[in-house]
Amino acid sequence: MHRINALKHLALLGALKKPVKISSSEFTRYTSTGSKTAARILKQLEEEGSIDRLIIPEGQMISITEKGHKWLESEFSDYKHIFCGDEDKVELYGNVITGLGEGQYYIAQDGYGSQFEEKLGFKPYPGTLNVRLTSHSADILKRKSQKNIIPISGFTDGQRTFGGCNCYFVEVEGVRGAVVTPERSHYPHDLLEIISPVHLRKTLELNDGDEVKIMIEDRSACE
């Protein structure tokens, strides 16, 4: 318990992003222990590989390692389960495919882009990741009642009319994004077009045919 609490406070001090300077005596303020216990906790975290530590005259430089990062993520998941539940989580699987190349054009339209940024909370990368769901996942999605649909209104730019669409939050292999589904009824139910603040293909090093896991989020439970 002391170790994960210490790791959490190191993260709050910024040790996930860069090394932070702190002495064992200073660290007692965050662990509610004596200086000897605080020093022992830091030594244990270092020995198990959760932190990197460099002793300097003024104290020590500490950074959280990848192992420590994963431990914190696991702890976060536990708390998320406690307070949010996971009955609305749905895992889907599919394969990356090449789209028609229209995603970049539509996302670049101000009428869509401004709504995405306002309603989804991020500015999408100009393009979509296209995923063809497995038949099993497509059936699951078809049966699922979406509780958190975010409508994007249609608009006209003076020359042509752009239809509306619906969005819902997802994570693709842990990277946040949103599925965009046009309102037109003939859109294939097994095809997902996903937008994200990052270039998903590049970030996740995906090629056509690669399988991806898509987690549908229920953000209303935790926000």
Swiss-Prot record:
Mg(2+) binds at residues 128, 130. InterPro entries: RibK_CTP-dep, Riboflavin_kinase_archaeal, Riboflavin_kinase_CTP-dep, Riboflavin_kinase_dom_sf, WH-like_DNA-bd_sf, WH_DNA-bd_sf. FMN binds at residues 185, 193. It comes from the Archaea. Keywords: Flavoprotein, FMN, Kinase, Magnesium, Metal-binding, Nucleotide-binding, Transferase. Pathway: Cofactor biosynthesis; FMN biosynthesis; FMN from riboflavin (CTP route): step 1/1. Its cofactor is Mg(2+). The keyword ATP-binding does not apply. Its EC number is 2.7.1.161. Residues 1-89 are annotated as: Unknown. SUPFAM superfamilies: Riboflavin kinase-like, Winged helix' DNA-binding domain. GO terms for molecular function: magnesium ion binding; nucleotide binding; riboflavin kinase activity. One of its GO terms (biological process) is riboflavin biosynthetic process. PANTHER family: RIBOFLAVIN KINASE (PTHR40706:SF1). This is Riboflavin kinase.
